[in-house]
A protein has these predicted regions:
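Surface-exposed ligand-recognition segments of extracellular binding domains, strongest
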Residues: 1
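N-terminal accessory segment detector
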Residues: 4-20, 30, 34-51, 55-246
Length: 246
């Protein structure tokens, strides 16, 4: 259940959840250099069960690709023993480092997902699909995020500071310039895109949908315009927030 927020699991087909298991859990043995290690899934929340559950098992023979993941719905997995689970050394993993690791883990979903979207559907459709998804996500999560960083809804200045706060949280630099009822945000660095290599510029349009959606929830009388893009060679990425011309 931890993967999906609220009732989102209701919209996830079984095949999508199984694809994640095939691409991740089933390949842990390969990644660890142990071809006998496979994963047994005993439950999935998307199938109406108590949640994603299962266990890793070392078999007596090397597993073929189709054997690395097995489904045994209804089987009771071994109880979790917290005392036996690996523990991070506190001296090497202080709280600040753990917070950054969790942040980077979350970013990795988008960092790896957007290029795959372009591979599967092509750059133009990836921009459309990603942007629409981003707008919905941005709009849905704006209220909760804004409350956590103490941003009040309404006004260009407030949303500019919202964008800057999230940029700083991602490890980038950001500045805000407010002029009357308009505001500009300049963001240096795009941590999310590090390691992308040569990727189509349409991926930026997909990612930018998050900000468009958040702005709709913040103040629907405002519009967001991109005025510079670091991924296209500009020194930084900039946005202008102003009252809509419509």
């Amino acid at each position: 259940r931890w993967v999906f927020d609220g009732t989102a699991a209701c919209a996830i087909p079984t095949d999508v959840s199984r694809a994640m298991l095939h691409g991740w859990y089933a390949r842990n043995g390969v990644s660890l250099g142990n071809p006998k290690l496979g994963f047994v899934c005993t439950s999935q929340i998307v199938d109406g069960q108590h949640g994603l559950a299962g266990y890793f098992q070392e078999f007596e023979h090397e597993l073929a690709p189709e054997e690395r993941l097995r489904f045994r719905p209804g089987e009771m997995p071994p109880p979790f023993d917290e005392a036996a689970a690996p523990q991070l050394p506190e001296r090497e993993w202080p709280v600040d480092r753990l917070i950054k690791a969790k942040r980077n883990y979350a970013i990795e979903y988008i960092r790896t997902g957007l290029p795959r979207l372009a591979e599967l559907f092509g750059p133009v459709d990836a921009a459309f699909l990603g942007r629409i998804a981003g707008r919905v996500i941005g709009a849905q999560y704006y209220k909760a995020i804004a409350a956590r960083i103490e941003i009040a809804p309404g006004g260009a200045a407030g949303f500019a500071h919202f964008m800057a706060a999230l940029a700083l949280g991602e490890g980038d630099e950001a500045s805000v310039n407010v002029r009357g009822n308009e505001a500009e945000v300049e963001r240096s660095g795009w941590r999310l895109a590090r390691g992308w290599g040569d990727q189509p510029p349409e991926l930026f349009e997909a990612w930018n949908g998050l900000w468009e959606g958040a702005l709709m929830a913040h103040d629907r009388s405002l519009e967001l315009a991109v005025t510079a893009r670091q991924d296209l060679g500009d020194a930084a990425t900039s946005w202008r927030i102003r009252p809509t011309s419509a």
